Amino acid sequence: MSLDIAQIALHQLIKRDEQTLEMVLRDSLLSTNAAVEEMMAELHRVYSAKSKAYGLFNEQSELADALRACRKGDEDFLSFSRAATGRLRDELAKYPFAEGGIVLFCQYRYLAVDYLLISVLNSCNSMRVNEQLDISTTHYLDINHADIVARIDLTEWETNPESTRYLTFLKGRVGRKVSDFFMDFLAASEGLDTKAQNRGLLKAVDEYCDEAQLDKNERQNYRQQVYSYCNEQLQSGEEIELASLSQELPPLGEKTFQQFSTEQGYELEESFPADRGTLRQLTKFAGSGGGISLNFDALLLGERIFWDPATDTLTIKGTPPNLRDQLQRRTSSSK
C-alpha cells in the first residue's frame, strides 16, 4: 500500500552553543518527488513498527489550535510548520541534551486515514563510493534510529474528539526526558495505556479460566489460543479486537469471554494495540535481577521447574546442554 503525501515541510534546528538553537526555515513546501515519497514511506514503515505511547491534546494546546486553523484553511501549512518549529525550538532549548536536527512536518493519507507526522531527524555523515571507485563524504537522514516522532490521526481527531488515542509518540531511547519535552511541545497528555489494557486482558483470561475450573493443561492451552490470536494481530499490524478474540475462543460455561470480561468490569477497550512484552507472559515466565536472568516456557512449571514460595527457591531439573557444558567446564577448571 502506498501513502499519498498532501503537504510536506522541512526546517532545521542547529545547535550553535550550549545556550543557542538556531532556526533555519524554508520559504516553500518541499516538492513531492520520488525521493521524498521513498523517504516518507520509510519513515512511516519505521514508525509503524515501533512501540508507541498514546495521547491527546490538552485544552490549552497552542499546536492543536494552530492545527485546527490550518485544517480550516485559516493558515497555510508552511506558516503552520514554521510557527510550530519556533515552539519546538523554545521547548527543546530547555533541555541539556538538545542537539537540533531536521524538523519534518508531513500531512499524508494512508488506508483512508489522514495523518500529520512531526519528527526531528538526525543528519549523519557517511562515506560513499562512486562509479570511479572514489570515496567521498555524504549526508543522510538517520530514519532507522528516529526517536523524536509524533503522529496525529487527523481523521480520528476530527471525527471523534473525545478519543484518547488519536496522538501517538515514541518514548525515545534516552528515556523519559525526550517524551517529556515533546509532550510539552504538543501540549498533550498521555491517553490510552496500552500496557494496562494488555495486563487487564491477561487478568481477565486467568480469572475466566479460574471460573471455569480448568486444570493446568487446559488453562495453558487456553492461554496459548489467546496468545496465538494476539500475536497474529501484532504481526499484521492490527489491534486486538475483543469481539474477534472472543469468537476465536471456545466459551467456558454459559458466558463467552467478551461477556465475562464486560460483566467483571476490566474496563477493556473494544480494541487496543497489542503489547509484545506483556503478551509474552501468556506462554512464558521471564525475569532478571541480581545477576540472574531466567526465561522458560510456562508449561515447564511443575514439570521440570519447581518453585517453593516458602523459601523463594526455584529448582530446575535438566539444564540446557549448552549451559550444562559451561558449568562442567568451569567446575573442572577450578579443581
From Swiss-Prot:
GO cellular component terms listed in the entry, alphabetical order: bacterial nucleoid; cytoplasm
Keyword check for Acetylation: no
Cited InterPro entries: Nucleoid_associated_NdpA (IPR007358)
UniProt keywords, alphabetically: Cytoplasm
Main location as per UniProt: cytoplasm
Compartments where located: Cytoplasm, Nucleoid
Keyword Signal set for record: no
Entry GO MF terms: double-stranded DNA binding; single-stranded RNA binding
Family: Belongs to the YejK family.
Protein name: Nucleoid-associated protein PC1_1634
